[in-house]
């Protein structure tokens, strides 16, 4: 089932992802910018700080350099972009899927945010109608939970390694 959200006037969609901040009993949400595809998504250092993550912990993640750093719709490169692993994540109701159910596990898990987090979806941005349509890729529904890394990967990606 495809989901549709409106693009803003600058040409990218803002989607909301729910996460549980470190040492917090409640869920919070973070915004992602989606441009012409999954490669243009990031969560900013500032937003992570607002959600209560320690600055040193954020900077312990992999800092994206050069071509690895995402760009926004204007073509400008995003500064201070870190690839970090968050304690828990749940995709919000804009998608309608629950990662715990998809992995057939009820335990909390970590999920790599950034470009990898959007690889499970097909993206279609219609700039004339100002909408972004996206849906979960059918073959990606079978996800593998890596207990050692505490992360999830699509089975197809794991089998290639």
Give the positions of each predicted feature.
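Pepsin/retropepsin-fold aspartyl endopeptidases
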Residues: 1-161
């Amino acid at each position: 089932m495809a989901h549709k959200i409106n693009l803003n006037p600058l040409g990218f969609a803002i989607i909301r992802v729910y996460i549980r901040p470190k040492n917090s009993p409640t869920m919070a949400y973070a915004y992602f910018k989606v441009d012409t595809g999954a490669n243009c998504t990031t969560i900013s250092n500032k937003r992570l700080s607002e959600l209560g993550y320690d600055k040193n912990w954020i900077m312990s993640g992999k800092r994206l350099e050069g071509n690895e750093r995402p760009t926004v719709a204007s073509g400008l490169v995003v500064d201070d972009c870190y690839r970090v692993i968050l304690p828990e994540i749940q995709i919000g109701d804009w998608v309608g899927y629950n990662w715990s159910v998809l992995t057939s596990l009820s335990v909390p898990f970590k999920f790599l945010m950034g470009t990898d987090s959007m690889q499970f979806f097909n993206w279609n941005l219609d700039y004339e109608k100002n909408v972004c349509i996206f849906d979960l890729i059918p073959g990606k529904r079978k996800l593998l939970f890596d207990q050692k890394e505490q992360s999830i990967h699509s089975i197809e990606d794991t089998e290639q390694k």
